[in-house]
Each structure stands twice: as C-alpha cells, then as structure tokens.
Amino acid sequence: MFVKINIEINMDEKLEKRLLTRNIKSTPMRVLVLQYLIQQNNAVSLQAIENAFRLADKSTLYRTLKTFEKNKLVHTIDDGSKKLKYALCLESCECEAIDQHYHFHCTMCQNTFCLTNQNVPKIELPKNFKMNQANLVIKGFCANCNR
C-alpha cells in the first residue's frame, strides 16, 4: 500500500513538472487531463475528454485544452472528421515548423495518430510568408482495422 501511494506521488510530481516546464500552473483538473492524454495512444476530441470526465465542468475542460495548446503542451489536428483532435506534443516540441509532422486518420475506427517520426519536409514559401502550422493527414486503415 505504501509503495502505491509513493508511486502516485511521484507520478503527480512528474505531471506537475511537465506542466511547469510549459509555464502552466498546476491544478488538480489540469493534472488529471494531462494524465488522461498521456494514457491515450491516439489524438482525442474534446467530446472524448468530456466523456472521460463526465462530472467536470465542460468549460473548464475546454479552457484547460486551450491553455495546453497556447503553451505548446498539446497540438490540434483537423483530420477531416469535423471534430478537432488534441494530442500531446513531444517534450522537446516548440511547435515550430521543424516540429510539424504527419498524422494518420483511420477511416474505419476514426482514430487519429501522430506520426512523429515523419517530419514534414521544408517547403520554400514565397517571400514574407511564414508557416505557422501544416495540416498533413494521411487517411487509411490503422493496424487494428487492417487485420
């Protein structure tokens, strides 16, 4: 029993540290949402997060995600499903052009995955143009649906 409590305390400290490294004040709800996002193996919609935290105030969850996005803890993905998805950024991510990567959207199960090992190639833009975000989504069947 003591070991479990110690592990939970260490986990909370790690989550709080991850928030603080992004200049995000730690609150119980922010820690819970961060923990939830870490446990997911794919990007999730606001609706999925609301379903996971049914008793939480919806506006609090929305503001939490917007705070995470503003401080580069998560990035958003428009995968064409008409539901914006949220995924954790890598700890080293600064959401610059070099950090942009492809996403894979399964057209069967509707899950969206970050392909962080596939960076978007640098594109030469016209003079005085600056890329803020690239939305590159590959669609097909994920490993589970392709069986």
Which residues does each predicted region cover?
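Short alpha-helical segments that sit at the start of domains
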Residues: 5-31
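Short amphipathic alpha-helical elements of helix-turn-helix/winged-helix folds
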Residues: 18, 35-40
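Short capping segments at the starts of secondary-structure elements
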Residues: 26-29, 40-45
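A short acidic, leucine-rich amphipathic alpha-helix
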Residues: 48-52
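Short, basic interhelical loop/turn and adjoining N-cap
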Residues: 55-59
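Basic amphipathic alpha-helical segments that dock to polyanions
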Residues: 61, 65-71
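Non-DNA-binding regulatory cores of transcription-related proteins
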Residues: 70-147
